[in-house]
Amino acid sequence: MEEGFRDRAAFIRGAKDIAKEVKKHATKKVVKGLDRVQDEYSRRSYSRFEEEDDDDDFPAPADGYYRGEGAQDEEEGGASSDATEGHDEDDEIYEGEYQGIPRAESGGKGERMADGAPLAGVRGGLGDGEGPPGGRGEAQRRKEREELAQQYEAILRECGHGRFQWTLYFVLGLALMADGVEVFVVGFVLPSAEKDMCLSDSNKGMLGLIVYLGMMVGAFLWGGLADRLGRRQCLLISLSVNSVFAFFSSFVQGYGTFLFCRLLSGVGIGGSIPIVFSYFSEFLAQEKRGEHLSWLCMFWMIGGVYAAAMAWAIIPHYGWSFQMGSAYQFHSWRVFVLVCAFPSVFAIGALTTQPESPRFFLENGKHDEAWMVLKQVHDTNMRAKGHPERVFSVTHIKTIHQEDELIEIQSDTGAWYQRWGVRALSLGGQVWGNFLSCFGPEYRRITLMMMGVWFTMSFSYYGLTVWFPDMIRHLQAVDYAARTKVFPGERVEHVTFNFTLENQIHRGGQYFNDKFIGLRLKSVSFEDSLFEECYFEDVTSSNTFFRNCTFINTVFYNTDLFEYKFVNSRLVNSTFLHNKEGCPLDVTGTGEGAYMVYFVSFLGTLAVLPGNIVSALLMDKIGRLRMLAGSSVMSCVSCFFLSFGNSESAMIALLCLFGGVSIASWNALDVLTVELYPSDKRTTAFGFLNALCKLAAVLGISIFTSFVGITKAAPILFASAALALGSSLALKLPETRGQVLQ
C-alpha cells in the first residue's frame, strides 16, 4: 500500500514537471520570435536563450529530474502543499519587465551599449578595476565624463523627443512662471499696501529690494544644493518655501512680518531659474536643446502677464475685503498676493509626478535609477508615437567613479540634532567645494567672463525696466503740475464746502465762518491764508498742505489733517477733536497711477513675445554667441532712442522696443550657461551667476532711479556702456552649438 502511494506521488510530480517544461519551451519560443522581429530596432542579443537551449537539449537523469539531488528532497517530495501547486519557480519573466539592470558580465558576447559599441569588459562604474581611487588623475575623470556625455546623448536620441519632454516642459514652465510673478508682486501692491501698513518712502524702497535680496540668496543656496541632493528634490523644497511664505504674507498685518515673509518667499523662488533650466536640459538631445530651452523662457513672460492681469482685475475691487475691528484688515491687494502664489502651488503638485534627472543619477553613481528613468522617457514617447512594441535597447550606462566624500553617522551616535549638524556641515562643505571648483584652472576663465556678461546684462536690463515706469510717473507728475489751477486773494464768507478740491493752489485767501464738511482734498495747497471761525468735519486729504496759514477759533472734527500738514502755520484757540485713525503719513492710494503701473507692466512683458519666438527658432541655426551678441548690440542701439522719449506714450513704446530686442540675449545666456558647465557643477554655477544677476539688478535700480527728474543722459550712457561691454565679452566665450551636454 505504501509503495503504491509513493509510485502514485512520483507519477503526479513527474507529470507536473513535464507540463512545466512544455510551458517554458512554448513561452520561450514565442518571446524569441517576437524579439527577433524587433531585432532591427533594438539590436538585442539572444545569448541567454542559446545558453538555456544548450542545457535543455540534455535533460537530467530520471532520478535527479523527478526526485531531486538528495535524500532530503526525496523524503519531502510527497508532502508538497497545495498552496504551492501551480507555482512555477522557473517561469520565464517577460522580456520588457525591469529585472535589475543587466551588467556587462551577464550580457554575454552580444551585449552592446547605447551607441552600439561592445562593452569590452566594462564592469560597474567607469574605471572600476583600474587601480585605487587615489591613483586616478583629473585627466582620467575628464575622459570618463566625455564618454558618459557621448553615450548619454546617444541614449536621448534613442528615447526621442515627444510626450515626456512636453509634459515636463509645462510642469517646469509653471515653476518659471512663479519666478516671473514674484518679481512683480511687490511693485503692484505698494500703491495699496502703503496705506494699510503706513509705509514711508524708505520702507517702500526696502520692500522693493528685499525680494531681490531673497532671490539672490535662494539662487546660490538652491543651485548649490541641487548638484548634491538632486534637481527635483531641491526644486520641490524651494517652491514649497515660496508658496508657504507667500501665503503667510497675504495675512500678516505688520510691516516687519510682511517684509520677513516676502524675504523668505524670495529665497524660495530664487532656486527656480537655475534648477529649471538645468533640469530640463538634461532631458533634451543636442538638436532640440537650444530651441526648447528658449521656448521654456516664454513662461517667465507669461508670469509677468498673469501678475499684471490679476492686479488689474483684483486690486481695484475694494468690496473684496473685510476687517475685524481696527487691528485686522484684509483688503483686495491681499487677495492678489494670495492668487500670485497659485503658479508655485500648481508647480509643486505637477512636479511630484515627474522623475529625477537621470543625468544627476549617473553623476552620483546611481546606474539602476538612471536606467529606469530613461526607460520611462523612451516608453512614454514610443507609446505616444504609436510604437509601443519598441523596446528600450540600452542595457548598460557608464557612471562616474565616486569619491568617498560622505560622512556616515550611526543612528546611535549622539543626539539627533548632533547627527543632523554633522550632516549639514558635511553637505555645506561639499557645496562650497563644488562652488570653488568653478574657479579652478579649467573653468576660471569661463566663470569670470560669464560673471561679466551676467552682471552687465542684469545691470542694464533691470535698471532700465524699473527706470521706465518711474520716468512715466515723472512725466505724469509734470503734466499734472502743468494743469494746476491757482486762486489768488479770494475772500469767502459763510460758505459750506462739501465737494472735492483737486490740483489747486489757494494763495492769500481769507475764509470767515466757513464750513468744510465731507470735503475731499487731493493735491491742494493753501498758502498765506487766514481761517477764522471755521469748522472742518469729516475731511480727507492726500498731498494737501497748509503753508504759512493762520487758524483762529477753528474746530477740526474727525479729520486726517495731521500736524505735519501744517507747515509754518499758527493755530490760535483752535481745537482738534476725534482725529481719524490710521496711517498718519500722506499716501496717494490707488487710482489712475496704479492702473498705469499695471498697464505698462502688462505691455512691457507682452512685448517680449516676438523676441521669444525669434530666439527659439534661430537659437540652433545661428548659434548662442551670435544671438547673445546681436541682441545686446540691438539693445544698446535702442537705448539711444530714449533721448526722444519726452511723452508718456513715447516712453511706453520705447519700453516695449527695449524688452522685445533684449529678451533674445537672455534666452541665449540661459542656454549658454547650461551648456558651458558639466553636470556636477551646472546648477551651482547657474545659481551663483543668477545670484550675481540679482545683485546687479539692485545696483542698477538704485543708480538709474536716482536720476529720475534730473537727467536722462546718465541712464542712457550707463545702459549703453554696460550692454556694449557685455556683448564684447560674450564674443570671447566658446560656442556650444552642436556640442553634447557635458
Curated annotation (Swiss-Prot):
Residues 1-57 are annotated as: Interaction with SYT1. The chain crosses the membrane at residues 170-190, 206-226, 234-254, 263-283, 295-315, 335-355, 448-468, 599-619, 627-647, 652-672, 686-708, 713-731. GO terms for molecular function: protein kinase binding; transmembrane transporter activity. Residues 32-49 have a biased composition (Basic and acidic residues). Its main location: other. It is a multi-pass membrane protein. CDD domains: MFS_SV2A. The modification Phosphothreonine is found at T84. Residues 191-205, 255-262, 316-334, 469-598, 648-651, 709-712 are extracellular. Pfam families: LD_SV2 (PF23894), MFS_1 (PF07690), Sugar_tr (PF00083). The keyword Transmembrane applies. Keywords: Cell projection, Cytoplasmic vesicle, Glycoprotein, Membrane, Neurotransmitter transport, Phosphoprotein, Synapse, Transmembrane, Transmembrane helix, Transport. This is Synaptic vesicle glycoprotein 2A. Residues 1-169, 227-233, 284-294, 356-447, 620-626, 673-685, 732-742 are cytoplasmic. Residues 122-137 have a biased composition (Gly residues). The modification Phosphoserine is found at S80, S81, S393. GO terms for cellular component: cell-cell junction; endoplasmic reticulum; GABA-ergic synapse; glutamatergic synapse; neuromuscular junction; neuron projection; presynaptic active zone; synaptic vesicle membrane. Belongs to the major facilitator superfamily. Disulfide bonds: none annotated. It is found in: Presynapse; Cytoplasmic vesicle, Secretory vesicle, Synaptic vesicle membrane. Residues 32-144 are annotated as: Disordered.
